[in-house]
Amino acid sequence: MKRTLISVSVAAALALSFPTLAASERGMDSDTGFLDEAMQFGGHVGTSLEYEDKVTDGFDGNKKKEKTTTHEVFGVYYNNARWNLSALYGLKLENREQRNPGYHENEDGIKHLFSLNKGFDLGNGWATGAIYELEYTRSKVFSPYVSGLRKELAEHSFRPYLTYFNNEHNWGFYSNLEYLYSSEDKSAWGERTEEGYSLLFKPYKRFGNWELGVELYYQIKDNEDRSSSGSINEISDFNEKYIEPIVQYSFDDAGVLYARVRVGENETNNAANSGGGNANVDYFKDIRKATLGYEQAVGDNWLLKGEYEYANEVEEKSKLAGWEAKNESELKQHTVYLQALYRF
């Protein structure tokens, strides 16, 4: 699941945490019907476009080039302050093009995004709640070896969270524990499942128009990949950790400029029965990522957002396979994200 969606959910959880929504904990008013309360909401509708360009200089000495375009055709966000409840749905079209020496691959897919967030105000700046998210993708792959190979991917995330904000000193934090599970059916290419947990902690402090924060993240995950005949391609465990300082400045004309820099690492440890030359092979990856973005309110209802991200990942492994030329794989990635929202 992309971190972009998780960031949106974090922002939604923080929005639900402020004391102005404390009245929502009263529950249903006996003088107001369910439908009347359901119609007391705000939110937004919108669209977005994301373009991602990746080049991987692999262990085999060849370069793999990938270009992915994701168009959010329609997205809607519902926020009911009385119930302290929000929901998000998005419909996206995704196209991925891959080019290797002597090989090419295209994948076209449709992605559905569902998110449900229920918050509870605890008083004195404290709030808690839980977020459930599902990303469901159906796609087809075209290459010299397959024509329209069908893939289905379901990624589930459940995140109970705890937040705090001190109005007097203008500081707070967001934290969550996550359970994640994904299942991918790749037809003739087999099946893959991933299951794990993560922990996120994000303290922040406001100084006038400035906001400074840092995101700390740790994840563990078990992976299993099998061919269509049931033979094992991969049995591995994975862990990742990063630190991401964040600087944000809010302009008086309702514009927000922000920058994030991520420094992290992850490790994949393959079991003795992993296939593809990966038996007992460990992978070590260093992650560097920088993001610069700007949001601007236009009039009373519109919000426009633009974001650029650069990522550099260098990976090494504990043992080379016979066909591999070097013990280093490097990825360089450029991503541009544009979004327009109409708020109501």
Q: Regions from the language model: what does each represent?
A:
Residues L21-N100, T335, L341-R343:
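Short glycine/proline- and aromatic-enriched beta-strand/turn motifs that initiate or cap beta-hairpins
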Residues G43-D53, A87-L93, A130-Y136, S175-Y181, ...:
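Transmembrane beta-barrel strands of outer-membrane/channel proteins
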Residues A81-A87, D121-A130, E168-S175, F207-V214, ...:
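Repeated loop/turn-to-beta-strand initiation elements of outer-membrane beta-barrel proteins
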